[in-house]
Amino acid sequence: MDIQRPRTSPTLPLDVHRKGREPPRSRSQTFEELVAGQPWGVRNQRWLAARSVLGPVGATLRSADSLRRAQGRLLDRAGLAPQPAPSRIQLATPAFRLRSYGQATGAGRPVLIVAAPIKRAYIWDLGPNASPIRLLLDAGLAVHLLEWLDPSPADVDAGLDRYVERISAAVDATGDTPVLLGHSLGGTLAALFCARYPQRAAGLALVEAPLHFGSDAGAFAPVVAASPPAEWLQEGFGLVPGVFLDVVTAAAAPREFVFERYADLWTSAMSGRLRLHLQVLRWTMDECALPGRLVADVVEQLYRKDRFHRGELVIDGSRVGPMTLTVPLLNVIDPLDDAIPATAITPFHEAAASPHKALLEYRGERGTALRHIGVLVGPGALTATWPQVIDWVANR
């Protein structure tokens, strides 16, 4: 009997830069070309190769996550643990908890804070002197915080759709029509919910939350363009370790997340803000993995294809984009932020169908360890920016 030898997979030409040949526009295209049009067996071999490489790396990174959390607990013993305001659990699920603050009745406009699923939600309430939540409470608002929990292996396939579904459950649990408030990726998720279900929100206040993606949308764009398809991360990692996201962030914006952080340590010591710097540093050690599908959706659907800004993203069976965001809209931008610059926000803001729109600027300050977090914890932000945000929220 003749034995058929397996076909070898075709290789890419090595002369892509020779005269007359168009070089690939980005590494992402090259990776896609590796599998495009090839037999299923070849494609499957490449997925298995990704898993065999990333699997052991993932185990190492998960150990690094555990080590960093242990380091954080040591800092807790040094007096740097968060000091949150009293709250109660309004809703508990395996994926998130809804915390409610203040009086259940007689409070003012309800506000639902959608925390970013990266790191921990207590950055919104580090302590008495670094807490937007306490400022909202002092203004008489009914405050709720959607706090994401560590994803389980069953959550690997939880993408943007699932996260919007969970926000929907949290909105229901507030028992009212709240203003949604979010920072960074938490704000992006809140925007997706409001664009899909505008009738269920009284307004949307976003703090340095990316809405427009693509080549002109900040430091992450070149990293995404030079990366293989993000589904490889889902296949290789399952749950993407927090340390991996730290490395990607530092590679994308080293000035903001590496060099300026160390410079801020020195200036914090000189300006009497060392404790705040160390509190934020302790928070950065509270690593949290993300579902592989969520990472893949953010990278592919948002950053690579900019589908939300283009109005091409489908959430719960319907397209969402600027044209479906019809709730009052507030955006806080930092024009000097490398990670989420104004160009990642203002094009969407201008295109949004919201009848009432407002734009505020925050230009950073020393003593907050990370510029991107300064708007949540900085004394300047809390005394100058947040009173304007609260006034806007209270008048929805």
Describe the predicted segments one by one.
Residues 181-186, 190:
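Gly/Ala-rich beta-loop-alpha elbow adjacent to hydrolase catalytic centers
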Residues 180-182, 207, 332:
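Short beta-strand immediately N-terminal to the catalytic nucleophile in serine-hydrolase-like folds
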Residues 327, 341-351:
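Short alpha-helix in the alpha/beta-hydrolase fold that links the catalytic acid
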Residues 149-178, 191:
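Conserved acidic catalytic loop of the alpha/beta-hydrolase fold
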Residues 355-396:
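Catalytic active-site module of serine/aspartate enzymes centered on a nucleophile-bearing elbow/loop
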Residues 325, 331-333, 337:
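Short beta-strand/loop motif that positions the catalytic acidic residue
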Residues 1-52, 175-176, 189-293:
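Alpha/beta-hydrolase-fold enzymes
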Residues 83-152:
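Short, surface-exposed "cap/lid" segments of acyl-processing enzymes
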